[in-house]
A protein has these predicted regions:
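N-terminal targeting signals for export/organelle localization
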Residues: 1-49
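Thiol/disulfide oxidoreductase modules built on the thioredoxin-like
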Residues: 118-127, 132-141
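Conserved redox-active cysteine motifs that mediate thiol-disulfide chemistry
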Residues: 66, 74-94
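Residue-level recognition of beta-strand->loop/alpha-helix junctions
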Residues: 107-109
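Short alpha-helix adjacent to the SAM-binding motif of class I
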Residues: 84, 91, 114-122
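A short beta-strand-turn-helix
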Residues: 42-45, 49-70, 93-96, 140
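Short helix-capping segments at alpha-helix termini
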Residues: 95-100, 123-127
Length: 141
C-alpha cells in the first residue's frame, strides 16, 4: 500500500512539474533568433505621439487611429523582405474593414512620397494606408 501511495504521489508531482514548465513556457513569447530584436512592453505602452506625414503631406499621429485595431509596418523600397511582404499585407487589408482593422504602411524612405507612391503603384499595392517617416522619428520612438 505504501508503494502505491509513493507511486501516486510521484506521478502527481511529475504531472504538476510538467504543468508548471509547460504553462510558464506557453506564457512566454518565442524570442529566439531574429525575434530577439523585438522589444516587448509589459504592461503595454501607449503609442508615441510622434508626427509623421500622410502621402498628401498632412501631419498625423497614431492617436488618429485610436478606435481601431492597427498593425504598423515599417518598410522601405530598398528593403527586400519589406518588398516581399507588401502584397500579403495588401491582401490582408483587403479582407478587413478599414474602420475596424487598419494596416499602416510607414515608409522610411528618405525620398518620401516621391519614392513610396510610385513604388506602391508599380507593385499594385492599393489597400494599405501609407504614412511617411523619412527621418525615422516614429520608427525610433
Amino acid at each position: 500500500m505504501k508503494l502505491l501511495s509513493f507511486i501516486s504521489v510521484t506521478v502527481l508531482g511529475a504531472a504538476v512539474a510538467v504543468w508548471f514548465v509547460v504553462g510558464s513556457a506557453a506564457d512566454q513569447p518565442p524570442l529566439e533568433g531574429w525575434m530577439a530584436q523585438f522589444t516587448l512592453n509589459d504592461p503595454p505602452q501607449p503609442a508615441p505621439e510622434t508626427e509623421v506625414l500622410t502621402v498628401a503631406g498632412e501631419p498625423v499621429t497614431l492617436a488618429a487611429y485610436k478606435d481601431k485595431i492597427v498593425l504598423v509596418n515599417f518598410w522601405a523600397t530598398w528593403c527586400v523582405p519589406c518588398v516581399r511582404e507588401m502584397p500579403s499585407l495588401d491582401r490582408l487589408q483587403a479582407a478587413f474593414d478599414k474602420d475596424k482593422f487598419l494596416i499602416l504602411a510607414v515608409s522610411v524612405d528618405r525620398g518620401g512620397a516621391a519614392k513610396a507612391v510610385p513604388f506602391l503603384k508599380k507593385h499594385g499595392i492599393d489597400n494599405l494606408t501609407t504614412l511617411l517617416d523619412k527621418r525615422m522619428k516614429l520608427a525610433s520612438a
